[in-house]
């Protein structure tokens, strides 16, 4: 009886294993499948590159410049975090690159460029590149191309919250808060990003040579000093509010507002021998962007209208002692 039970138990364990081997080894031959689609008339001849949303959400400390450098072929010229970062397509300058946010151009009106270090990747839901003349369908003046940025309505009902924090070296802190609400008619999204850092790293200054003298004042040696980065701290605050409302008749109204408050120190020249902490070189920026829109899709016909507003207060400050006698003078624009 015991021998019979043992044999039955072994057969019971062996049958599933054999079935599993057969199922994994089984192959099914199917006929070829053709997948076809129609390209809209306005997309014919358009060279477009879509940026993966995973790249935009990869790192809280990343700006849009980092995301473009990682996920696209566009050339990004950057001097480090919280410093000027520009984008240019092949064979063109940064001023030839147009940038739109929800359909509104955000290029600097003075130089025509856009500082991508002031655009957090967490604030962008959709990003695409239109190369060369492909940008004429969206905006004009883009000899090199267009960087198209946008936000999308909240999908799903209910209230959701997301909080991400990052901590780095040299007293660097990043905090991101995202609050969303979705209902039958209304949807809302609130994003807040706050970044701050002392950015006082140590480096060997090869542009400043120190000499070692003996008791008689004769030079007996020399070395390159180890110094800290002065005046390189930054503080960035971003707040974005979005509201969407859909009527029963199919009309959708939207409002998106983005406020930026930035204070950035411009690092001193490595050849500057003035070590006084009173010397300052800073750039402050306060920018407000707002876009209101209306869309209607009915009977295969899409109508829409948008209105945008932008305001920028950019101030540069230089506090120095031009005579070298300790009398510091403030120069500002």
Where are these regions (language model features)?
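Outer-membrane beta-barrel channels and translocator barrels
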Residues: 94, 154-156, 183-186, 246-250, ...
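Flexible loop and strand-edge segments within Gram-negative outer membrane beta-barrel domains
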Residues: 201, 230-236, 246, 250-299, ...
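N-terminal periplasmic "start-of-domain" segments of outer-membrane beta-barrel proteins
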Residues: 30-61, 86, 94-97, 127
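Non-catalytic regulatory/gating segments with a bias toward low-complexity or hydrophobic composition
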Residues: 68, 127-128, 147-149
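Short acidic/polar hinge/loop motifs at secondary-structure boundaries
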Residues: 104-132
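Transmembrane beta-strands of outer-membrane beta-barrel proteins
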Residues: 159-163, 188-192, 253-255, 301-307
């Amino acid at each position: 009886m015991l021998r019979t039970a043992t044999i039955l138990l072994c057969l019971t364990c062996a049958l599933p294993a054999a079935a599993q081997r057969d199922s994994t080894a089984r192959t099914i031959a199917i006929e070829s499948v053709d997948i076809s689609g129609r390209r809209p008339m306005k997309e014919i001849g358009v060279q477009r590159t879509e940026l993966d949303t995973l790249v935009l959400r990869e790192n809280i400390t990343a700006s849009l410049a980092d995301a473009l450098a990682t996920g696209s072929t566009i050339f990004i010229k950057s001097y480090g975090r919280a410093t000027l970062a520009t984008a240019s397509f092949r064979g063109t300058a940064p001023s030839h690159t147009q940038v739109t946010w929800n359909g509104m151009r955000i290029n600097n009106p003075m130089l025509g460029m856009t500082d991508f270090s002031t655009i957090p990747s967490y604030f962008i839901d959709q990003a695409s590149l239109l190369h060369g003349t492909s940008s004429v369908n969206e905006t004009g003046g883009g000899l090199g191309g267009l960087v198209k940025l946008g936000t999308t309505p909240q999908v799903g009902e209910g209230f959701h919250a997301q909080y991400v924090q990052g901590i780095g070296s040299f007293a660097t802190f990043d905090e991101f808060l995202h609050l969303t609400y979705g209902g039958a008619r209304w949807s809302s999204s609130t994003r807040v990003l706050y970044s701050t850092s002392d950015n006082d790293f140590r480096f060997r200054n090869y542009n400043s040579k120190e000499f070692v003298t003996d008791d008689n004042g004769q030079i007996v040696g020399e070395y390159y000093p180890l110094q800290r980065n002065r005046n390189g701290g930054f503080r960035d605050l971003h707040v974005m509010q979005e509201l969407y409302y859909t009527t029963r008749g199919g009309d959708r109204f939207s409002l998106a507002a983005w406020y930026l408050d930035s204070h950035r120190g411009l690092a001193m020249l490595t050849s500057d021998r003035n070590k006084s902490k009173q010397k300052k070189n800073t750039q402050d920026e306060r920018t407000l962007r707002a876009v209101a829109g209306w869309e209607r899709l009915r009977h295969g016909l899409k109508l829409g209208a948008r209105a945008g507003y932008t305001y920028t207060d950019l101030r540069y400050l230089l506090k120095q002692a031009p005579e070298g006698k300790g009398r510091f003078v403030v120069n500002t624009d």
